[in-house]
Amino acid sequence: MSFRGGGRGGFNRGGGGGGFNRGGGSNNHFRGGGGGGGGSFRGGGGGGGGSFRGGGRGGFGRGGGRGGFNKFQDQGPPERVVLLGEFMHPCEDDIVCKCTTEENKVPYFNAPVYLENKEQVGKVDEIFGQLRDFYFSVKLSENMKASSFKKLQKFYIDPYKLLPLQRFLPRPPGEKGPPRGGGGGGRGGRGGGRGGGGRGGGRGGGFRGGRGGGGGFRGGRGGGGFRGRGH
């Protein structure tokens, strides 16, 4: 599951249909990186884990496309909302919030953000920080001002616009992933054609980490944690 750019079914930058990533490892990459486990969102270690920025049909990335998770159409407030986070400080015309979701669930990029009364204040713009202690920024709606919010004011989200953190963590030892070169199915081998799995790299994933383990978030806009399209 990677984001930014992408052909049909692709998960990360550039890439043909069904391809997973431009740089590294087996399955679910974030964007770029060295080898090894651990993980970070946008950058960092190799393969497994999951990824944000990407594009193409079926992907999570920034551009539109079918089957993606971002660029949500405004369909009015959801039936119910759950706690997403707390206001920390303004940043130019945006606001920065600490994520306080249950079980550290990760919001989709571009997912609408609400007050408790379901009034929309903006959309999730960036995610950054450590895997289990992260923040997000909100790009405010035109009628909202960053200076109008108080410290620790709570914000809410549609529960269907959250993903479990486990989606971005390395697999437990001994757990097998999909066959090499599989993933998107269809033609192609390593690095890119249809169904390709990407070259090099180990398992890992993560948010914006450095090489190998550890890791933090640093995601961009997009669906599903994810820089991308409509759900």
Curated annotation (Swiss-Prot):
Biased composition (Gly residues): 1-68, 179-231
Coiled-coil ranges per UniProt: none
Region listing for Disordered, in residue ranges: 1-75, 167-231
Annotated spans, RGG-box 2: 180-231
GO biological process assignments: pseudouridine synthesis; rRNA processing; telomere maintenance via telomerase
One Gene Ontology CC term in the entry: box H/ACA snoRNP complex
Keyword Ribonucleoprotein (UniProt): yes
Covalent cross-link Glycyl lysine isopeptide (Lys-Gly) (interchain with G-Cter in SUMO2), where: 145
Subcellular location as annotated: Nucleus, Nucleolus; Nucleus, Cajal body
Any one Gene Ontology molecular-function term assigned to this protein's record: telomerase RNA binding
Domain of life: Eukaryota
Family: Belongs to the GAR1 family.
Quaternary organization: Part of the H/ACA small nucleolar ribonucleoprotein (H/ACA snoRNP) complex, which contains NHP2/NOLA2, GAR1/NOLA1, NOP10/NOLA3, and DKC1/NOLA4, which is presumed to be the catalytic subunit. The complex contains a stable core formed by binding of one or two NOP10-DKC1 heterodimers to NHP2; GAR1 subsequently binds to this core via DKC1. The complex binds a box H/ACA small nucleolar RNA (snoRNA), which may target the specific site of modification within the RNA substrate. The complex also interacts with TERC, which contains a 3'-terminal domain related to the box H/ACA snoRNAs.
Function: Required for ribosome biogenesis and telomere maintenance. Part of the H/ACA small nucleolar ribonucleoprotein (H/ACA snoRNP) complex, which catalyzes pseudouridylation of rRNA. This involves the isomerization of uridine such that the ribose is subsequently attached to C5, instead of the normal N1. Each rRNA can contain up to 100 pseudouridine ('psi') residues, which may serve to stabilize the conformation of rRNAs. May also be required for correct processing or intranuclear trafficking of TERC, the RNA component of the telomerase reverse transcriptase (TERT) holoenzyme.
Domain notes from UniProt: Interaction with SMN1 requires at least one of the RGG-box regions.
Protein known as: H/ACA ribonucleoprotein complex subunit 1
Record organism: Mus musculus
